[in-house]
């Protein structure tokens, strides 16, 4: 693949890609085959897998109509390209919606390393650098086909992303076969199923095939033989070194299938920091030592030039190193265990990714600058051609004008020729259409005028009716008002007081007050009864007022008496509380005095006593491990007796 990339990018690859140049095509394919197996295994458990920098394998649920208003829920695997990669290169992909109840796990490099002979850093570097090559190929608008073993093929052509799954993989995801038929029959997904893997591998030469990457740097590497013992037979294994000057490089031994099964049994959550002790196995006759199995990081691997370490001493009696507070077992475990600091490693990777992105951005900027420069040169050449053409045309026009300076563009005819018959027919048609338009316009104006006159007459009739109705209403209201006034005058005449008596001169009888006696008597009786009622009401009110005053006085007296009793009770309670407080204080003082005397006696006795009196001071003689809380001379034995423990001096098996 490096042969198709520019020389500047080849130099950059040699500087910033340390892992891929040390691997062959078969090893890269093996690593990605293990990655595909991990993805397929997680999809079989209905879990999605996220490959950082590439995309996510997950599931999508759809309802397919099978007829008669019946639907079947189908769950099919899908691949969603990473949004960052899509935005960077302007890729196009069909939008797929995945449900939120499907868990998505990241790519676990530790689990992949347990399945093959490569360590975690090698696998991670191979995956990331392969994705960098993929991003570079997409940026230069090349056709890319990325094969996932056992899953399908990811193709990118003309900035369009398409994931095609193998038919066997879809059948393993859905044993009923409905999913394969549904995808093959639908217009949008009919090209998402590969019926034959061999036929699809015959791809054109213009397409970049991933993950097989060719490197020229791997040709000069010398293989190193690592001999491992497995079942009593020595089998050589050739492994290529990264660099001869690299101190952290080392030989890797392919473990037996049994050991692979033991490694696979480890759960992913417990393999965050793996550092196994070197295991030495001696055969019964030859006494040969096998190479160590080490799953830690490359910084913790041994070189081939180092000799195998001898087995540690069986016991350590004194064990009095400076600051040593651990037993023999914990000390050996701490010396052989190397912690993996993921924070520093993560920061280092982030810095490396940023540096790669900066260099990649510089390359893209240079390419854009070169493209703009080429476009500018092409535009300049085109402008020069246009200017030369315009100059030639202007020169030709100028020469033509100079040759015929008295050329006129207008002409005068003495007699206008007659129009042909075809134009006469057209003129007749035009005149007929104009006459029709005039007639229709005239009819329209007449109809509008008639409508206006009709509306005016209707408005006049309506106005006349409204005026007549208003006149009738006015007359009706006037008649009602007249009748009202008449009834009022009749009532006044009816209720008119009697007239004054006629004047009689020299009359001996009284004129006024003849019938006033009876009225005065009735009036006086009414006044007397009213006064009597008022006197009774005043007396009852006064009596009620006096009774209320007496009741209030009695209530106030009772309240004062109750307040006095409560005050006396409060004073008595306060006196009791003060007395109790004084008594408690006196008792506390006596108790404190007795305790002080006792403490003084104990201090004097402690001063007279010898050292190592307390239990904690006595425990200093018995050193304990700070991790397992056993004695420091512990070499791994247990305080529990086995079932076949033989007691000395006895013939019993306990």
Swiss-Prot record:
Query: Where would you find this protein in the cell?
Result: Cytoplasm, Cytoskeleton, Microtubule organizing center, Centrosome
Entry annotated with the keyword NADP: no
Region entry Disordered: which residue ranges? 196-270, 293-318
Show the GO cellular component annotation of the record.
Answer: centrosome; ciliary basal body; cytoplasm; plasma membrane
Which ranges are annotated Basic and acidic residues under compositional bias?
212-222, 232-251
Q: Which Pfam families match?
A: HU-CCDC81_euk_1, HU-CCDC81_euk_2
Task: Give the compositionally biased regions (Polar residues).
Answer: 293-302
Q: What are the entry keywords?
A: Coiled coil, Cytoplasm, Cytoskeleton, Phosphoprotein
- Where it mainly occurs, coarsely classed, is cytoplasm
Residues carrying Phosphoserine: 206, 273, 275, 296, 419
Recorded coiled-coil stretches: 431-562
Q: What is this protein called?
A: Coiled-coil domain-containing protein 81
Q: Which gene encodes it?
A: Ccdc81
